[in-house]
Amino acid sequence: MSTSVPSALRIEGLGLQIGGATILKDVELDVAAGSLVGVIGPNGAGKTTLFNVVSGLMKPTSGRVLMNGDDITSASVPARARAGLGRTFQTSSLFPRLSVLENVRLAAQVSLGGDYSLLRFPRRSDAATRLALTKLEAVGLTHKLETAAGDISHGDKRKLEIAVLLVTKASIVLLDEPMAGVGSGDVAGLVENIRDMQRESGCTVLMVEHHIDVLMGLVEKVAVMYFGTIIAYDTPQNIMNDPLVQSAYLGTAAA
């Protein structure tokens, strides 16, 4: 008797229009819990916009977004975060003047029941500090605890963002171009950090990435976006051999 893995994230008929322009059109996606899924497509295909809608930064014109079976289409950004949705952006979302440790400790304090007010943030909370140090050790940043987040490399910033996600215990994680700006020598380590995050927490990961070779070696399935819709969703091997996908990247696929 076979058993199917429940959906962590389900997108049904999602559409977005802005000023009469169609940005997303009939997007359908079913992401199994605990899976690691890549999202690829040409520039302007709608990948980041899709993440913006899923994370609540933009409201769709039509369709639904379900998280673990619950309709979150109208939920606020904080409500989605409380439900377990985490995200990184193409540009850093860290507090640049706070140290590496303070960035993660702040997130840890919130995870332990505090809030994001820096005025009320207990800088020496033992529980938050222990949690932060554990996650910083996991991503290999304990040697930069007192360095300002704005002063570390792009690769280390990505690692720091993963440490923040780990302390928030996000069950669904959206990674928007995590390799952007990362030096070639740091890519392999960051890939391992993403794998470790997924294994350790059991979270579901969706990842937009232009480094196709890196992505294909990391994910279990790939969704291909083209002109605001998903034209293919399959294993990396099948995606690479799909004529429709190949023509989309050559610019000849039907919209």
Name each model-derived stretch.
Residues 2-255:
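Glycine-rich phosphate-binding loops of nucleotide-dependent enzymes
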